[in-house]
Amino acid sequence: MRKGHTRRKVLQGTTAIGLSTFASPYIKTSHSAGKLKMGVWDHWIPGTNGALEVLLQKWGEANGVEIEVDFIPSAGNKLLLTAQAESRAGIGHDIYVHAIWMPTMFAHRLEPVDDVIEDIISSEGPMVPLAEYLAKVDGVWRASPSPVGSQTHGMISRLDLYKKYADINLQEIFPGPKQKRNSELVDAWDYDALLEAGQKLHAAGHGIGGPLAATGDASFWVAPVFAAHGAELVDKNGDIVVDSEEVRTVLEYLSKLVRTMPESVYAWDDAGNNRWMISGQGSSVFNPPSPWNVAKRDAPQFAEQMWCHDLPRGPHGRYRNFIPQFWGIWDFSENIAAAKDLLRHVGTRDITYQMSQVTTGYDVPLLRSHAEGNDVWAKAGPPPGAIYNYPIRGDEIGIVPGYPAPPPMAAQIMAQAIFPNLVSRVTAGGDSIDEGIRWAANELEAVMRG
């Protein structure tokens, strides 16, 4: 039986934010001035922060703007906690990073940037649809594309281990550049195939990995597994539907899959995937290519065996998390004109291209034209083609945790880590599947009540 609640109740329960607060009118000039404080994501890829700061400072010098940049790590939910503190206090950075659902969560304190987006799209072309879904709140753009940080969470696996212990040639299924995929091989890569491979790899001491603590990376891999099985927590109408056969089925599956992982996954933070692959024990994780990037420096013998590829197919399709990252302007900024000019600047192809070269393709552009003609994913190695399949190239559907719930509710599903907490309770916490579902339903009802 499915539990139902109206969309209106969900929106009422999760909208604990007031009316939008607009900054004082400003006069846009051809030459920005003043000072901008920026809080941006502390990038995983070595050298990225320094390269980004050079680009920002160069723009500042050319436009008479003093730029101050703070790089804020995602570990420990520091990005979200800092945003919450600044939003409540009405003081902090001028420009702040807003990933995934944060434009929805902080829409009441974010300056509208419709004019910025209009200029960027007029110059650069359209963004991926998911960007509008996340950053355009109630018809108003609240954030603009970040030049760094947008990413997908496909799989990254060890070619040698899959061949040796699971008899699977991942390069044959998901080949590199200038090679055509075999649709039959791709179709056969489903969640049953992953489970069978994971069991063999685990028995050989090389299990797959996926965090199950209350961390972003945990939601990023669990949510697509749910989606592929047609399992939803809240549907597109805002009704709580966690009490379903589809959810029971996916929890039964995950109870088996988790046994192919190390017990430490329940304590992993957002660096856990990297550590697992660089240790030499890991055979697969669900992650951007940061393990490969770091391994090139710290464990090159493992890096040369790593390969990015698609997630498995489930009964309801193949899904992958696409994690857009935006920059927004707090409405308490005292230099909104300069902040908007800077957002326009970093929304250009030249800036995106430069940063993609620095990150060796870790960042996936939100503007479609910025990915076209960029050969960074084809050129990167070793091995040649290692990250070619990191951008979505096949039949995967890009989603974000909480999909397909209305954005206000989906934002809370992500913030409350309901996906990994539910899986953890069932696979390690002693709850039966029915007990876990009842817990999740209660949590979702509490979110609705605000």
Model regions and ranges:
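Conserved N-terminal structural module of periplasmic/extracytoplasmic solute-binding proteins
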Residues: 2-107, 118-125, 150, 168-178, ...
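A local structural motif
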Residues: 61-73, 91-92, 171-185, 236-239, ...
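Short helix-initiation/N-cap motifs at beta->coil->alpha
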Residues: 71-82, 188-193, 265-278
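Paired acidic/hydrophobic, glycine-rich loop segments that form the ligand-binding mouth/hinge
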Residues: 94-97, 283-288
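Hinge/lid segment of periplasmic solute-binding proteins
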Residues: 99-154, 303-312, 383-394
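Short, solvent-exposed loop/beta-turn-alpha elements that line the ligand-binding surface or hinge
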Residues: 115-127, 171-187, 231-251, 297-301, ...
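Glycine-centered hinge/linker elements that transmit conformational signals in sensory
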Residues: 191-202, 236-267, 311
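C-terminal lobe and pocket-closing loops
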Residues: 290-303, 315-421
